[in-house]
Amino acid sequence: MIPDASSCCSADSISRAKQILALIPGRATGAYSHSQGIKGLRDAIASGIASRDGFPANADDIFLTDGASPGVHLMMQLLIRNEKDGILVPIPQYPLYSASIALHGGSLVPYYLNESTGWGLEISDVKKQLEDARSRGIDVRALVVINPGNPTGQVLAEENQYDIVKFCKNEGLVLLADEVYQENIYADNKKFHSFKKIVRSLGYGEEDLPLVSYQSVSKGYYGECGKRGGYMEITGFSAPVREQIYKIASVNLCSNITGQILASLVMNPPKASDESYASYKAEKDGILASLARRAKALEVAFSKLEGITCNKAEGAMYLFPQICLPQKAIEAAKAANKAPDAFYALRLLESTGIVVVPGSGFGQVTISLVEISRKTNI
């Protein structure tokens, strides 16, 4: 027997479900929607963005997607014409970006996060990499920023974000802001600020800086990875470019309706006045507190291990420790014809059953070329 919904759900939850169903064509999740997503759900997301940032948001700027990844692929398809088009990507990097750039035939232009300053983004280094790429005939078209960081777990300082936005404005770059871990902040002295908020705080208007912001229901405290929901918010693009974005989105007809609903709920959760708010807040706070405890436990554990250093956990779901291998391990790796970090990762797997990815898998380089034979990351 199926229980009466009113016996197990709060009144506001039932009311919300009915409101959402009324927005969907055919009042069911099996029909196609508008290619950008159901208008009422985009309205809810726009309202959530406005509430978060303190600046208006427009439902027409929002494209609902099957997770953040399809939005990334869409923009790479739009931005990359041939191998001479480049995208600036942070290293260590989330492999989605290198794979998507390669898939669409472009060139990855790396900029290296500074491990010694807590994985800081140094504008001077980004500019150096940009100028070097341009000197090689690469037309650099966009800058990717992941905040909070994946796989490094840092949270950008607000001042650093202002510098990044100004840099993109001055250099004519599209800013691709991966903000899927915006709820995961563990450091007391850190706070998430969206790049949309930073852009508007600088007084930039709709046509001043092309910005694409990504959000996903796979991350944060919700973790609905298999539901495949998310969105991208596009601002600062001209009408002809927006038309092309819409055309590409229309090729896939629409994202799945269940994911669209979840994306709207993530950005428009229960309010304090709702009956369901107490249980919602308790579950959310419990999950985030658990993630914070585990991040801290790993940070402390790494700091106690010989030959390992690790920056503090600030956000996202990651730590990126550095391992200083002894000379005998370097020699053993060479004898086995393997890179030291890959050799270490395989030995760790064989000895403990623990699976790790060598630092080189994230594009990571050692602190200096002199120490390249001694230092690695996992």
Feature-to-residue mapping (PLM):
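PLP-dependent class I/II
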Residues: M1-Q36, G40-I378
